[in-house]
């Protein structure tokens, strides 16, 4: 990814010089910087995980904010549960944010026209659960068995890498779980992320 990102940076600088007052050019720079940060984190997957005990709420809020700016106003995201003060888990913030954004993006893609996405939090003694639900088209039983297979996709334009990579980040890197909690065709889908609380929390 290094060379394409460098090329994007160069083009962004050219645009910034040519259109210094354009409101979208700074946003482009922020997105490129963010892409570089995520790429750097991905390169470290497979090495020793560097997880920290952090509040989950700001990570989820950042993911929602990022997606809201990029979706139709016909789709709502209910994140009222994120008004809670603190939910501390072991995490790597940039990677976890990418996973949540990927789930939100999939939810948006599943909705035709108007619809709703809901984030809910649950917890037990050892774990915090994040549920991302949508009112989209749902996933049939045959597809459900394959959604985490690398290269499998039900989209016309897609590589089939998002969910497998998200699962790897959560399960191998965070020591948690990413699963399809439920899905019904014509009703919607819920994915669940399970993350560990710090020991002695």
Report residues per predicted region.
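Short beta-strand/loop element within the Bergerat-fold HATPase_c
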Residues: 114-126
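Short alpha-helical Gxxx[C/S/T] motif in the catalytic ATP-binding
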Residues: 162, 166
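Short conserved segment of the HATPase_c
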Residues: 139-151
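Conserved DHp (HisKA) dimerization/phosphotransfer helix of two-component histidine kinases, i.e.
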Residues: 7, 22-73
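Conserved catalytic submotifs in the C-terminal HATPase_c
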Residues: 76-87, 125
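Acidic ATP/Mg2+-coordinating residue in the GHKL
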Residues: 134
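Glycine-rich ATP-binding loops of the HATPase_c
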Residues: 174-182
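Detector for a conserved hydrophobic position within an alpha-helical segment of the HATPase_c
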Residues: 170-171
